[in-house]
């Protein structure tokens, strides 16, 4: 995720930590975890997603290997996190404009919405077991919430992105491929890290097919290439940031307008 001051906050999954990296710097700074793999409150275990909660000046972290969601203050003297939810097979996180927290669960094949501090939550996508039906998901990972509280879900092993309108009982398919990270702009254009095809896809609303806007020539390590892209984020200047997973780097691409 990219903060307003052009600081990138990165989930460093294999090193069990969250790192912030100011654009242009040669080194990042560990801001959560970083004390080896573990389950203590100062440790993380294979984190998969993070978001910035500006109202409380904190990070909310999906601590996947520990089956918990943590809140971690961004104050410099913070040494450990606080458990918001535990015993949850979380993968992706999002927050809407009313500060509801959304979490995908890869074992229950659902997305739930929570008020901060609530433990039970409300199912807003899936929840009907693993399956291919429009009311089902199969290991949902990354999620995005738009201004109307529609839920966009990377429905990983169904190889699709599903859109669930607020209070809907089933979703609609808005992308097919190998989705991981995703972002939806105000015109409902969908941007997806199509990890299996090593490319970033843009899919305008109503389009019958998408366009590759980065990568797409097979895996590679050149600046124009990607190798299993996972995370995806935009900054306020419309630049696209991609966690280029198997190249162990974050790539930045200026976004070209839709012709």
Segments and roles (model prediction):
Residues 227-259:
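Blade-level signature of beta-propeller repeat domains, shared across WD40, Kelch, NHL, RCC1
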Residues 2-5, 52-56, 95-98, 145-148, ...:
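Residue-level detector of Asp-centered blade-edge/turn motifs that repeat once per structural unit
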Residues 9-33, 73:
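Beta-propeller domains
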Residues 25-48, 75-89, 118-141, 166-180, ...:
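Gly/Pro-rich loop segments of beta-rich domains
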